[in-house]
Amino acid sequence: MSNMQFSRGFNPFVILFCLAVVAPIISADVAILRTDYYQKTCPDFHKIVREAVTTKQVQQPTTAAGTLRLFFHDCFLEGCDASVLIATNSFNKAERDDDLNDSLPGDAFDIVTRIKTALELSCPGVVSCADILAQATRDLVTMVGGPYFDVKLGRKDGFESKAHKVRGNVPMANQTVPDIHGIFKKNGFSLREMVALSGAHTIGFSHCKEFSDRLYGSRADKEINPRFAAALKDLCKNHTVDDTIAAFNDVMTPGKFDNMYFKNLKRGLGLLASDHILIKDNSTKPFVDLYATNETAFFEDFARAMEKLGTVGVKGDKDGEVRRRCDHFNNLNV
């Protein structure tokens, strides 16, 4: 006789039946991501993305940084569901039109549109905009010298994009380390992962309005490298009448993904206040020191954090769709 004993009224077969019924319900809304998701349904997916990003990056070298930033802003609000791509219409102000997102580069939106157009000709109605943004980001990061990381696919595009939800979910340039980490933490990221992802500022640029308060008046930051501060003051002197004026986040190697961002922080060359505080705060300084001296450690941590970022809040079939156009929901009344 078996040694297994069951209490009175306990029927294991009923439990097994319940699990069999409930399991599909539990998993139905969860996207199952895998790297070969489009192998059969859109076999040219990787080729089409790679060719499009190569052409665009050659034409406009800031595309990589812009797309990386767009991906981050997408994933940190409502998850990686392409909600940041939705255009505002007469009955909804979308995420991309919130003040915190108004400087998201047009080239980043453009590359997603280019890829979507090509994919719709090759395999219509198959590839989500969320997957396009994720894959394009990885390919562009590696193109400019950054680390390779796996991109698992199978995300669906979300049904919601609300501008009023942006604030409090995307870090701001003047926030403290605890404030910024609070945003990262609720998305499952540690302090070390936060610093690693901040290293994305090794490429790209920021507009003067995002750091001008560090340059002028009684609140001017005395810890900025004096020569750097003087150059920024000259660059931004007309920023109130021309809000397109911008400076490179990494003044030394702005187009190369490397660990120079962290080296710059130690020299007083951090552009944003939120950059500079990483070297000032005792909780984040050890990671800045590590990455400044060990690019391999930075690349490894960044790659792992990016793989993790790509899984934040992904949508399954019930909670998402494959949009026909990345800037509109399929149901325009949503």
Swiss-Prot record:
Disulfide bonds join C42-C123, C75-C80, C129-C326, C208-C236. It is an enzyme of class 1 (oxidoreductase). There are 73 peroxidase genes in A.thaliana. This is Peroxidase 65. Belongs to the peroxidase family. Classical plant (class III) peroxidase subfamily. SUPFAM superfamilies: Heme-dependent peroxidases. It is found in: Secreted. GO terms for molecular function: heme binding; lactoperoxidase activity; metal ion binding; xylan 1,4-beta-xylosidase activity. Its main location: secreted. Ca(2+) 2 binds at T202, D250, T253, D258. The keyword Cell cycle does not apply. It catalyses: 2 a phenolic donor + H2O2 = 2 a phenolic radical donor + 2 H2O. It comes from Arabidopsis thaliana. It holds the Pfam family peroxidase. Keywords: Calcium, Disulfide bond, Glycoprotein, Heme, Hydrogen peroxide, Iron, Metal-binding, Oxidoreductase, Peroxidase, Secreted, Signal. The active site is at H73. Removal of H(2)O(2), oxidation of toxic reductants, biosynthesis and degradation of lignin, suberization, auxin catabolism, response to environmental stresses such as wounding, pathogen attack and oxidative stress. These functions might be dependent on each isozyme/isoform in each plant tissue. Glycans are attached at N174, N238, N282, N294. Its EC number is 1.11.1.7. CDD domains: secretory_peroxidase. The record marks R69 as: Transition state stabilizer. It comes from the Eukaryota.
